[in-house]
From Swiss-Prot:
NCBIfam families: cobA_cysG_Cterm (TIGR01469), cysG_Nterm (TIGR01470), PRK06136.1 (NF004790), PRK10637.1 (NF007922)
Keywords: Cobalamin biosynthesis, Lyase, Methyltransferase, Multifunctional enzyme, NAD, Oxidoreductase, Phosphoprotein, Porphyrin biosynthesis, S-adenosyl-L-methionine, Transferase
Binding site for S-adenosyl-L-methionine: P231, G307, G308, D309, I312, T337, A338, M389, G418
GO MF terms, alphabetically ordered: NAD binding; precorrin-2 dehydrogenase activity; sirohydrochlorin ferrochelatase activity; uroporphyrin-III C-methyltransferase activity
Residues binding NAD(+): E22, V23, L43, A44
Natural source organism: Pectobacterium atrosepticum (strain SCRI 1043 / ATCC BAA-672)
Record's catalysed reaction(s): uroporphyrinogen III + 2 S-adenosyl-L-methionine = precorrin-2 + 2 S-adenosyl-L-homocysteine + H(+); precorrin-2 + NAD(+) = sirohydrochlorin + NADH + 2 H(+); siroheme + 2 H(+) = sirohydrochlorin + Fe(2+)
Post-translational modification Phosphoserine, affected residues: S128
Protein name listed in UniProt: Siroheme synthase 1
Amino acid sequence: MNYLPIFADLRQRPVLVVGGGEVATRKIDLLQRAGAEVKIVALALAEPLAAQHQAGQVEWLAQSFTPELLSGVFLVIAATDDAELNAAVFEAANQRHLLVNVVDDQPKCTFIFPSIVDRSPLVVAISSGGQAPVLARLLREKLESLLPASLGTMAEIAGSWRDRIKTRLHSMPARRRFWERLFVGRFASLVSAGQLEQAEGELQQQLVNQQDEQQLPAAARGEVALVGAGPGDAGLLTLRGLQVMQQADVVLYDHLVSADVLDLVRRDAERICVGKRASTHSLPQGEINQLLVKLAQEGKRVVRLKGGDPFIFGRGGEELQAVAQAGITFQVVPGVTAAAGVTAYAGIPLTHRDHAQSVIFITGHCRPDGDSLDWSTLARGRQTLAIYMGTMKAAEISQQLIAHGRSAQTPVAVISRGTRHDQQVQIGTLQELEHLARQAPTPALLVIGEVVDLHHQIAWFGQTTPTVPQDSRPAVVNLA
């Protein structure tokens, strides 16, 4: 992040604008909408600015710029077509540690103006940091069409009730829940329809409901949401998953959850890494189960965020059993499992009419006392094997499949960090699986079957060419 997005209170604060032409006029209009006291330094004024000066709306200093004019100023804008003058304004302001913007000269800016969607008091600011202003403008236009004009009225009503809500709902979590429910419910529809009196009545009813809820024991208010985070690319997170993450009081997450997905969690939610990887846990599974129950019994909305889908080799079922036995309300938000997302990004269809009529999901990390795999069934042809957490067992997997009849030349793929910018796909044969797995960064998915050969034709993610040369050695393809 090259710029920190902040909202400055300019009401009754002096802002100096150097320049009196068309560009200065546009900037001054924006400053006045924010309540700034504008001083213009220019030898002449464009007609709109001259009219504002006559009306007493701006102060005009009809002289050349001197550094002394910066005394007592909050921020500075240079909006002239004189590069030398603009540079002088920048240097003088910078020496005095004043925020300064030289229009259309980013290196001479200590702040920049974003594209704005104005639904005052709700304001959305968009910036590309000066790298792609047209892209920022297009995004603003998109948001203009998506955000209803009634949002401003909704925010004004909320502001008028804010102090009263604080006196009746004493805890921050209770107030947050109240506002979240209010803004997505009937209240929003009434405001949008212009029925403001009815909207305030709905607000009062929701406040009563929230107060009644606060009388319940904490354990009755807490809840757990088991959310699948997908394989890594934040774009694969479900809409429902995002909504639940944005409402969480606390989030328990694994190492497999990508940083991009974690960035979507509500900013002030507590985050606890329980750090699960194959055979390695920051917390034992039993302690994770107990922590989920404990946090929910404190009245918190708990999100258990798991890579992929929580019910596919994620032990999500075990966690929910503990939650259910404690009598806690819960919900499940499915996620894109690694076998589906990672293979799609690698250009490997799990089934194909010519190659595989079935797919089997397998974990390489079984219980030590568990039953052994049915290798005879797994070694059959015309099926795809997708093996989670299998890199440490790659040698055994290869040996057993070959021993039970699968061809040693069966195509295999080891896909590391799938769907992420640093995804790697290693292609080889079943007899080379141990070597490929040893090379692969983790986490990695093993894919075994004839469908792997289609990678050479339809790989698409991050590549400049859809084909990968084949030779007798494993091919390592970096799809970063």
